Amino acid sequence: MWWRDLTRLRLWLKREAIPGEGRKAAKVNAGVGEKGIYTASSRGGPPSARSKAVTVVAEGAASRSWLSMDAPELGPGLVERLEQLATCPLCGGSFEDPVLLACEHSFCRACLARRWGTPPATGTEASPTACPCCGLPCPRRSLRSNVRLAVEVRISRELREKLAEPGARAGRRRGGRIPTMGCLDLPGEDMRKTWRRFEVPTPKSSNSEDDLPEDYPVVKNMLHRLTADLTLDPGTAHRRLLISADRRSVQLAPPGTPAPPDGPKRFDQLPAVLGAQGFGAGRHCWEVETADAASCRDSSGEDEDDEESHYAVGAAGESVQRKGCVRLCPAGAVWAVEGRGGRLWALTAPEPTLLGGVEPPPRRIRVDLDWERGRVAFYDGRSLDLLYAFQAPGPLGERIFPLFCTCDPRAPLRIVPAES
């Protein structure tokens, strides 16, 4: 039920907002399931005004921490990401009566009706309908209500309303900092205090995604709602690249490996390959496991040395140059980050930008494409910390494809399946 999901989400947000508490605080909060209780209406409905959800925790857990009132976001932009997940790609607003297509994309029912037009009269031939995001044929009869997404929209709205309350920025002490407890509130205290940990944002979450409560998959589902199920397009791969049988990993082929014939869509100098799926609207995410790899700014396709591996991951426009030297920057229709020498660089012009504090580069990189906003952002795939974001002045204007570039036969780049 949605109110139970909301209660659990509140609990997880409270734990995420505790900086510096480390594993000890995480374990204290995660243990509420054993020593804590929740009270709700006896008939299983949502908590009423007379029966609010109250959490009781074991004694001795009241470690005190100080949280800043001036941090811009909750964790690494958690609330903003939840709102993005609850946004219709057609109208740009929160989902209203969301429906799910056969291709797993969701839209407002009214927005989709306007896009597809009026249904044909009975007895006449129906005009073909397709998904506005991926273009796959989706008959009208395949529409079904997305109840789970509707619940997530409601959770997102309530979070935003709570963060917008005047009390969220009241009660400043000690130069803009207020005391909060490292444990949950005791029974009988004002319920507004149970919101304080996400009313008072923290600049960085200390817990990784893998540390989320195992019995609460809704949070992971919300963060991964836009994760695309990608495969590689062998027809675009440089002839020296080796694509796996499942088309989810790529590496430089060992010497002596037979090369496929050249083609008009292949990169002939840059050791790169594009994803088979392109996006011309909406928001889409994918994750890449880099292992020890990192990208090759030398687009000659030759190894620069035998001791250092290279990779680049990101996105490229359909118009990206396939033959000759490729401009690895937004002006060349490429938005990517590069790992080399144990460091991570954003491929900007005229020179790449070193991303300080990202050493060594994360083993998983999450690419977040927002086509309408013209934004391509990169996150640590496990902590979800923002690494870098490219921002165009408007929509990207063409179909965008995932981009993978590697110069190492020992460390392949692997697409993380959407369900991982």
UniProtKB/Swiss-Prot annotation:
InterPro entries: B30.2/SPRY, B30.2/SPRY_sf, Butyrophylin_SPRY, ConA-like_dom_sf, PRY, SPRY_dom, TRIM/RBCC, Znf-RING_euk
All copies of domain B30.2/SPRY, residue ranges: 210-420
Pfam families in the cross-refs: PRY, SPRY, zf-RING_UBOX
Catalytic EC class: transferase
Localization of this protein: Cytoplasm
Keywords annotated in UniProt: Cytoplasm, Metal-binding, Transferase, Zinc, Zinc-finger
Gene Ontology terms: cellular component: cytoplasm
Residue span of region Disordered: 246-265
Reactions the enzyme catalyzes: S-ubiquitinyl-[E2 ubiquitin-conjugating enzyme]-L-cysteine + [acceptor protein]-L-lysine = [E2 ubiquitin-conjugating enzyme]-L-cysteine + N(6)-ubiquitinyl-[acceptor protein]-L-lysine
Zinc finger (RING-type): 88-135
UniProt entry tagged with the keyword Transcription: no
GO biological process: innate immune response; negative regulation of cytoplasmic pattern recognition receptor signaling pathway; positive regulation of cGAS/STING signaling pathway; protein K63-linked ubiquitination
Gene Ontology molecular function: ubiquitin protein ligase activity; zinc ion binding
Keyword DNA repair annotated: no
Function statement: Plays an inhibitory role in anti-RNA viral innate immunity by targeting the adapter DDX3X and promoting its 'Lys-48'-linked polyubiquitination. Alternatively, enhances the cGAS-STING pathway activation by promoting 'Lys-63'-linked ubiquitination of STING1, facilitating the STING1-TBK1 complex formation and STING1 activation.
Protein name: RING finger protein 39
Natural source organism: Pan troglodytes
Gene: RNF39
